[in-house]
Amino acid sequence: MAEIAAELVAVEKALWSGTATAVIAETTEGEIGVLPGHEPLLGQLVENGVVIIRTTEGEKLVAAVQGGFLSVSSKKITVLADSAVWADEVDQADAEARVREASSEEEKSRAESELRAVKRSKEK
């Protein structure tokens, strides 16, 4: 199976770097799936979206991301997010409570993004 270098980087830290068979991201133009050999592009990530990385080892990595960019070149896919959290690090009960008790639309949207990431991580 074809592979490409990929990385997920948040402003505060690098979350993952390796080789991937696919990267799926929610951009302002819609959800986009990027495979090795994709045409170069630069996309803007939605404010409270989900990114999925399928590694060459067969892992499915899912993260909730808050804004940023998706950069695709012939040699590398880079997801540069303002902030990001892995789906498996999300406390689902806490996120559900934050959705109910959010004092701002931004807080609610971030918690909803985390819950979507958890849900997407459980899909095949």
Swiss-Prot record:
Gene Ontology MF: a single term: proton-transporting ATP synthase activity, rotational mechanism
Keyword Nucleus in annotation: no
Major subcellular site: membrane
Region feature (Disordered): 97-124
GO CC list: plasma membrane; proton-transporting ATP synthase complex
Membrane topology: Peripheral membrane protein
Chain segments annotated as coiled-coil in the UniProt record: none
Subunit structure, as described in the record: F-type ATPases have 2 components, CF(1) - the catalytic core - and CF(0) - the membrane proton channel. CF(1) has five subunits: alpha(3), beta(3), gamma(1), delta(1), epsilon(1). CF(0) has three main subunits: a, b and c.
Family affiliation: Belongs to the ATPase epsilon chain family.
Chain's role: Produces ATP from ADP in the presence of a proton gradient across the membrane.
Protein name: ATP synthase epsilon chain
Organism: Corynebacterium urealyticum (strain ATCC 43042 / DSM 7109)
Taxon lineage: Bacteria, Bacillati, Actinomycetota, Actinomycetes, Mycobacteriales
Gene designation per UniProt: atpC
